[in-house]
């Protein structure tokens, strides 16, 4: 599903602004204030496939609910760009997924593993993972466990109830961690997990899929908690069939996992986590409800209220300087949504999960927001 996102970075805050997904944390970056987003650091010791061992700082992005908690935890893990692009792979910010999880009642910790972003350099413990899947998996999983230990120092986190999740190599990391059965772990969510793919050089043909099946089948015997595996048909890293074989190896090895397969998403289904929330959110929500986390968290548009006509720009409760943004919203394709804040700010989105993205884009500046319009209807009720 094609996604178009638009949000204005200066609608609710004065002073320097400018946030970009994956960019290094800079003085001008606008953090998600409503999620209490911040970057903390811990240390981790890891080995590469050659036996070289290093101890380095691991930056951890934090998203959390209001209040003191303690809240259950999700450790969310990033993927790995191809070698040509890894140097520019910045801080991982799965903000929209984190918004859902925080609304569900979780603290979300996102470690930027060693060899990425601020620790990119000569030491890469995930190098040649295609040849040594176990070495790279353990290096990555060790940093999940280091993040868990760090979380025990945070008073708002309950580490006796936690989940692990991730996308691509972060999904591989998730499976490896579940296979270690750490204390307090309740489940794992694997978005498009794997390693050894190259969508440009060999689309749909990872370099060592048999080794992946063997490795996951072997570590499955130690797994104790259920998993949810989510893959998209047009994944250009793994193709449509390899993930099913990997899942079968995991289950036949003695582990529990539900496989959720989705149709094509965008030009490369490998990125369905970001581009196909409309489809995966209900599936993940059902999984979390089964684990006991039943708080509603998926943003849905209310019924039309008749407050104003959809094209009545002057009726929109935003500052006068923001009226033009609503006019732009009216030119967007459906599905689309427009949210307003209590301070006259706004956020809008068109495409996948438009309602949730619009509200998130609006309230990331720290002010409460509500949907004003969805598709061709005004859904806002004056407060």
Please identify what each model-predicted range represents.
Residues 21-69:
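N-terminal cap/lid segment of alpha/beta-hydrolase-fold proteins
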Residues 70-79:
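Short beta-strand element of the alpha/beta-hydrolase
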Residues 81-94, 109-139:
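Cap/lid segment of the alpha/beta-hydrolase catalytic domain
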Residues 130-155:
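Alpha/beta-hydrolase active-site loop
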Residues 156-168:
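Alpha/beta-hydrolase fold nucleophile elbow
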Residues 187, 193-258:
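The feature captures the conserved acid-bearing segment of alpha/beta-hydrolase catalytic domains
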Residues 251-307:
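C-terminal catalytic histidine-bearing segment of alpha/beta-hydrolase fold enzymes
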Residues 295-383:
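Helix-coil modules at protein/domain termini and other flexible surface or pore-lining loops
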């Amino acid at each position: 599903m094609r996604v178009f996102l638009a949000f204005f970075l200066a609608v609710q805050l004065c002073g320097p602004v400018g946030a970009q997904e994956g960019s290094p944390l800079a003085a001008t970056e606008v953090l998600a204030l409503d999620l209490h987003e911040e970057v903390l650091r811990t240390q981790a010791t890891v080995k590469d496939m050659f036996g070289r061992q290093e101890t380095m700082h691991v930056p951890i992005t934090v998203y959390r609910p209001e209040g003191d908690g303690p809240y259950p935890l999700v450790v969310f893990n990033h993927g790995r760009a191809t070698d040509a692009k890894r140097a520019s792979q910045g801080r991982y910010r799965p903000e929209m997924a984190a918004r859902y999880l925080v609304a569900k009642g979780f603290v979300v910790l996102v470690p930027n593993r060693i060899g990425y972003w601020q620790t990119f350099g000569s030491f890469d413990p995930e190098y040649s993972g295609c040849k040594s899947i176990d070495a790279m998996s353990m290096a990555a999983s060790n940093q999940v466990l280091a993040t868990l230990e760090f979380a025990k120092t945070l008073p708002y986190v309950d580490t006796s109830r936690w989940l692990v999740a991730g996308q691509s190599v972060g999904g591989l990391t998730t499976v490896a961690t579940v296979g270690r059965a750490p204390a307090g772990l309740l489940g794992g969510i694997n978005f498009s997990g794997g390693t050894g793919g190259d969508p440009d050089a060999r689309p749909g043909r990872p370099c060592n899929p048999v080794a992946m099946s063997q490795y996951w089948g072997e570590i499955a015997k130690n797994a104790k908690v259920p998993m949810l595996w989510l893959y998209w048909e047009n994944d250009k890293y793994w193709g449509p069939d390899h993930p099913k074989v990997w899942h079968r190896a995991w289950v036949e090895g003695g582990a529990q996992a539900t496989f959720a397969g989705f149709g094509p998403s965008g030009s490369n289904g490998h990125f369905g986590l970001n581009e196909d929330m409309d489809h995966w959110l209900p599936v993940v929500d059902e999984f979390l409800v089964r684990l006991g986390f039943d708080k509603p968290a998926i943003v849905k548009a209310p019924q039309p209220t008749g407050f104003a006509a959809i094209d009545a720009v002057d009726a929109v409760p935003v500052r006068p300087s923001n009226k033009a943004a609503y006019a732009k919203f009216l030119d967007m394709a459906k599905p689309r949504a427009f949210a307003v804040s209590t301070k006259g700010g706004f956020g809008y989105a068109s495409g996948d999960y438009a309602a949730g993205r619009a509200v998130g884009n609006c309230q990331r500046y720290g002010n409460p927001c509500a949907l004003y319009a969805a598709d061709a209807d005004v859904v806002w009720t004056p407060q």
